[in-house]
Amino acid sequence: MGLGAAYKEGFRYILDKLDSELIVQMDADHSHQPSEIPNMLEKIKNFDYLIASRHVEGSDIVGWGIGRKATHSVAGVIAKACAKIEINDSTSGFRMFKKKTLERIDFDKIRSDGFAFQIEVLYQLKQLGMKGLEVPTVFVNRTEGSSKMGSSEMMQFITMCISYIGRK
């Protein structure tokens, strides 16, 4: 099961079974800091969703070399242009949603089962007129395991970008 498929299943479960007004999404590899959630709780009041961004003032990325940072930045610029979204860190896995926001996403329309899933969600949120905010985060690269980013992920990203060309 890819990342996007896991998110779809998890979000559907949460929306069906749990009674919570806010949902926090974060990676399980300790790269996101749970200590940042209280700040996010304060900031979401006037927004539909938040992105803990590695690309806003006050953010930091620990454990990435210059090459990884550059690749990530370029991919972010491409995603932003293709999907016509305002978010700078479109692949951040640290997010907070109001439940009513997640309920409006049509997960069946999302084709990507990898990292591009994150961008497709943002595209739908933009189409729905949802209001988002990026907040600074300290991202700590995992100390164990390895990135799942590979040729399959890159192909999904390229396919997604091409599919958005010509859309509003």
Enumerate the predicted regions with their spans:
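Residue-level signature of catalytic and energy-coupling elements of molecular machines
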Residues: G10, D29, K98, L125, ...
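Catalytic donor-sugar/metal-binding loop of nucleotide-sugar-dependent glycosyltransferases
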Residues: I85-E86, K109-D113, L122-V138
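Short glycine/serine/threonine-enriched helix-capping/active-site loop
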Residues: Q25, I51-S53, V135-T137
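Acidic, glycine-rich active-site loops and adjacent beta-strand->loop/helix elements
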Residues: A28-S31, N141
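Acceptor/aglycone-binding surface of glycosyltransferases and processive sugar-polymer synthases
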Residues: M1-D16, L22, P34-F115, R142-F157
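DNA-recognition element of transcription regulators
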Residues: I119
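C-terminal catalytic/acceptor-binding lobe
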Residues: L128-K168
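Short beta-strand-to-loop acidic/aromatic patch adjacent to the donor-nucleotide binding site
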Residues: S20-D29
